[in-house]
Regions:
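Aromatic-rich, lipid-facing transmembrane alpha helices and their immediate juxtamembrane interface loops
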Residues: 1-259
């Protein structure tokens, strides 16, 4: 059963990714890669779907559509808020923002989205699970175990690289700020030297800054630069005391990280 639920988790994470991307096409008219990871999966969907499936299979076996809907609304809201809070505290970043949506709480959750997840819960329990789970269980046990192990390996590798990219990006931006301060000290010290023109020092210092920043920020990930750009492109923005700086660099990195 473990392999069955692992495969189910990954498939529902993929379905959640498709749902998010299609929803963005409907709302904005353009494709937008969604999710925290580089791969086409959104684990929060797979996790909630799996938790709901286990809950209504082993905890509450006699349930009604109304109870499924209400539990899905509350559970998804709690999970979405906690995940958003954790990611924001861990990386000072956010991947979705409901601040412009009605009845939102700190931009992390909103009533319309939670109601939508409630409807999704009904679709999963009554329409998807009765067909998807039996199909997975029909796969021979050995093959099912192999597939689940491959999926876990790919998922773990993606998660590890994603965490490394985000941590490296934030660290390098903070280090670059120190370099900027060093160059500003150089400029301030230089203008007191009357033997040379002030403009030449400004140009010299900022040339060094541009070369240093380009090398330090735009090419930090080697052969994984394309992978890193894909991860960073999904970050919607940063919050906190360094938000302005991080958002400025993020916008430039999205377009120039491979240059």
């Amino acid at each position: 059963m473990v392999s069955t639920y692992l495969i189910y988790f990954m498939l529902m994470s993929f379905i959640g990714y498709l749902y998010e991307c299609l929803a963005m096409i409907i709302w904005t008219g353009k494709w937008d890669n969604r999710g925290f990871l580089y791969g086409p999966v959104i684990p929060i969907y797979g996790g909630c779907a799996l938790a709901g499936t286990l809950f209504f299979t082993y905890v509450i076996k006699d349930f009604t559509p109304l109870s499924v809907f209400l539990i899905a609304v509350v559970f998804s809201a709690v999970v979405e808020y906690l995940v958003h809070y954790y990611l924001e505290k861990a990386f000072h970043a956010y991947w979705w923002d409901y601040s412009k949506s009605p009845l939102n709480i700190n931009g992390r959750i909103c009533l319309p989205a939670s109601l939508g997840f409630g409807l999704a819960g009904l679709v999963i329990i009554y329409l998807i699970n009765p067909y998807l789970l039996p199909v997975i269980e029909k796969i021979p046990q050995l093959l099912r175990d192999i597939i689940s192990l491959i999926m876990v390996f790919i998922f773990t590798a993606d998660l590890t690289l994603t965490l490394c990219v985000l941590s490296t990006f934030i660290s390098r931006v903070e280090n670059l700020e120190n370099r900027i301060n060093e160059h500003m000290d150089e400029i301030i010290g230089s203008v007191t030297d009357e033997s040379k023109g002030i403009n030449s020092y400004f140009y010299s210092a900022f040339d060094k800054l541009e070369n240093s920043g380009r090398k330090y920020i735009y090419r930090p990930f080697g052969i994984f630069s394309g992978y890193a750009r894909g991860i960073l492109s999904r970050v919607k923005g940063f919050r906190g005391k360094s938000a302005a700086k991080l958002n400025m660099v993020l916008n430039r990195v999205k377009n120039r990280i491979t240059r």
